[in-house]
Amino acid sequence: MPFAQPPDYSKSVFPIAVGIAVAVVLFTLTRSTLPQVGDNIHNLPHGGNYQDGTKRISYCGPRDSFPSSSLISSGTPMIIGIIIFLIFAIYVSEKWSRSGSRRCSCCVPGAPACTATVHE
């Protein structure tokens, strides 16, 4: 009775994991961290004026130094630098940890590219 390999789910799980990771990163970068200004009906997060009867709201908006909800802000060069540094660090660690030779994790003994030994 020949043994069958277990199904390889990595090809279907990997795109799902990447999609979830991208969604979490975009949600984190685009969520609003601005203070809530106004009441339950009138919201002025970016500044403005509103007058209704006896109610008057005048808000000048957040300062440039306040962390905003925009995806591209003044801290973007630092974020890009951190990403490039992490990519470089992963590349260097992969080069040094493998000591130059790569072997396949699963190979058939006797195949031309296989370095495994035959055990009987």
Curated annotation (Swiss-Prot):
Q: What is its main location?
A: host cell
Q: Which residues lie on this side of the membrane: Cytoplasmic?
A: 1-8, 93-120
Instruction: State the family named in the UniProt similarity comment for this chain.
Output: Belongs to the Tymovirales TGBp2 protein family.
Transmembrane ranges?
A: 9-29, 72-92
An annotated GO cellular component of this protein is: host cell endoplasmic reticulum membrane
Q: Which organism is it from?
A: Apple stem pitting virus (isolate PA66)
The reply on keyword Endoplasmic reticulum is no
Record's keyword annotation contains Membrane: yes
Keyword set, alphabetical order: Host endoplasmic reticulum, Host membrane, Membrane, Transmembrane, Transmembrane helix, Transport, Viral movement protein
What is noted besides the main data? TGBp1, TGBp2 and TGBp3 seem to act together for cell-to-cell propagation. TGBp1 is the main movement protein that physically cross the plasmodesma with the viral genome. TGBp2 and TGBp3 would facilitate TGBp1 function.
Name of the protein this chain belongs to: Movement protein TGB2
Those parts of the protein on the Lumenal side are: 30-71
Could you mention a single GO BP entry for this protein?
Answer: transport of virus in host, cell to cell
Described by its record, this protein's role is as follows:
Plays a role in viral cell-to-cell propagation, by facilitating genome transport to neighboring plant cells through plasmosdesmata,.
Subcellular location field: Host endoplasmic reticulum membrane
